Amino acid sequence: MLQLTEKFKGTTTVGIVCKDGVVLAADRRASLGNIIYARNVTKIHKIDEHLAIAGAGDVGDILNLVRLLRAEAKLYYSQSGKRMSVKALATLLANIMNGAKYFPYLAWFLVGGYDEKPKLYSVDMVGGITEDKYATAGSGMEFAYSILDSEYKDNLTLEEGIKLAVKAINTAIKRDVFSGDGILVVTITKEGYKELSDSELEATLKQ
């Protein structure tokens, strides 16, 4: 199982809590062992207007869980009239992962969203869950953490968070052969979910 897990772990995802929202970022490369098999993969997935997850690992397992979480979030809203909270989504995902730990989903998730305030959780392959101000997952996580640990500070603006997330991903791309081929950045604020276009990202980085 460990060899299989190693084979599917390539990527780098980053999550950062800012004073006005959450930033999720990920590279776009998909690899299988030493082979690059896709260069424009979406690794950040919208669950609803105020919830999203970033997944590092096996694409099939990640998409299967994304479909399940979207359905659960819609069901929760239809039954209660309320949106599922970030903590509830992360806990649900952790319970699913833990329930499958003997035949695990080969994935590690960052769960970000906005309730009364921005929140970020990390959920590992066997259902361990941690609330963080910043987190990273995937084969480039050691390199990304070197940037986040030294440069993160409380009360970052959304623009500062975007710049830090991109810097962390770019550092991983330079050192990790399993990460690369561009960066996707998503923000989640009280106004909702937004995926930055290439031009919007470029403009933010120039500020």
Swiss-Prot record:
Alphabetical GO biological process terms: proteasomal protein catabolic process
Residues that make up the propeptide removed upon maturation: 1-10
Pfam families to which the protein is assigned, alphabetical: Proteasome
GO molecular function per UniProt: threonine-type endopeptidase activity
InterPro entries listed in its UniProt record: Ntn_hydrolases_N, Pept_T1A_Psome_bsu_arc, Pept_T1A_subB, Proteasome_bsu_CS, Proteasome_sua/b, Proteasome_suB-type
Active site: residue positions: T11 (nucleophile)
Enzymatic reactions: Cleavage of peptide bonds with very broad specificity
GO cellular component: cytoplasm; proteasome core complex, beta-subunit complex
UniProt superkingdom: Archaea
Location in the cell: Cytoplasm
Swiss-Prot/TrEMBL keywords: Autocatalytic cleavage, Cytoplasm, Hydrolase, Protease, Proteasome, Threonine protease, Zymogen
Reported regulation of activity: The formation of the proteasomal ATPase PAN-20S proteasome complex, via the docking of the C-termini of PAN into the intersubunit pockets in the alpha-rings, triggers opening of the gate for substrate entry. Interconversion between the open-gate and close-gate conformations leads to a dynamic regulation of the 20S proteasome proteolysis activity.
NCBIfam families with a match to the protein in the record: arc_protsome_B
Quaternary structure and interacting proteins, as annotated: The 20S proteasome core is composed of 14 alpha and 14 beta subunits that assemble into four stacked heptameric rings, resulting in a barrel-shaped structure. The two inner rings, each composed of seven catalytic beta subunits, are sandwiched by two outer rings, each composed of seven alpha subunits. The catalytic chamber with the active sites is on the inside of the barrel. Has a gated structure, the ends of the cylinder being occluded by the N-termini of the alpha-subunits. Is capped at one or both ends by the proteasome regulatory ATPase, PAN.
Family statement: Belongs to the peptidase T1B family.
Name of the protein described by the UniProt record: Proteasome subunit beta 2
Organism: Pyrococcus horikoshii (strain ATCC 700860 / DSM 12428 / JCM 9974 / NBRC 100139 / OT-3)
